[in-house]
Amino acid sequence: MDFALRQITERIRTATAEHTPLRLRGGGSKDFYGESLQGELLDLTPLNGITSYEPSELVVTARAGTPLAELEATLAEQGQCLAFEPPHFAPGATVGGMVAAGLSGPSRASVGGVRDFVLGVKLINGRGELLTFGGQVMKNVAGYDVSRLMVGALGTLGVLTEISLKVLPVAPAEATLVFEIDQARALAQLHRWGGQPLPLNASCWVCDDTAPGRPELLFVRLRGAMAAVDSACCKMTQVLPGTRMDNAVAGPDWLAFRDLHLPFFTQPQTPDNALCLWRLSVPQTAPVLDLPYAQLIEWHGGQRWLWAPPSAQTLLRQTAEQVGGFATLFIAAYAGTTGATARFTPLKPPLDRIHQRLKAEFDPAGIFNRARLSPSF
């Protein structure tokens, strides 16, 4: 056990003995996400570095504090990538934070999310024990896949120290098509395209308030073999008139979209500046939602963003639930505030009991990121 790992382990054991809450933190790029930030800071950035990388095996293992940008740069040198496009939000994003937050970028609906690429993890539980789950190969899992359990847990179950991930080759060709089309027709067309052998990778529908006439635009990104991408562009523009964008323009736009840096994600100016950014996760086949708020739609209809006040939570959550989804208050109106509005949709009692039992098993003293997922967790 190296010095950094030993120090962190000792700190956890002391905190458990003294019932001192700890706030786990890597680069802090996702401090805005979740409920409250409670406890003494436990800096995990000393746990950094890529410990194993086998390009031929499509597997990389990195310590939790490794900068995400560093990992992606190393993969790019070998023509490989994290296919789920994890958002950075800020320069300090780390591999551990990526897994703990469980957030994926524009390609999520086509390639899968973070949990689909996690092969194994090492973590320190609330007893100060170093545990290993999973490994460095893809295999059928018999029993509970604890590695993936850590994805999206926001550090509430343990301190991630090392993560093994599946990586993929960068697609040899890419194209972005843009169509002027209203929301209902865009969703219907995406569903039709989704049932065809097309190399769909990402999509985004938005009403462009910055352009004359406020056009409603659908952007579709294709990735795959050159012949497949070119053929798809021809087929799709024959069905629906559209334009192929220059990759030099589209590429930076998709990166900005991944990190929520597009103009849509700038908080609208209102008299009290009390609008929050909400994320509605719904089935791709969900229809146009009857909501009085402008939306940006991605994941071929499966994720819908909008700005609304905290008071809209009942409407948003009921609307999402009616179509089989849920709503998350992603960014609060004021930085560092939580207020009375729950960030995440409250769990049903049976599921909440499972969460509580898992918390009691991994973190019996309740010291890790207390109340980050919910006030009672």
Tell me the role of every PLM-derived stretch.
Residues 37, 55-56, 125-127, 208-209, ...:
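Short acidic-glycine loop/turn motifs at beta-strand connectors
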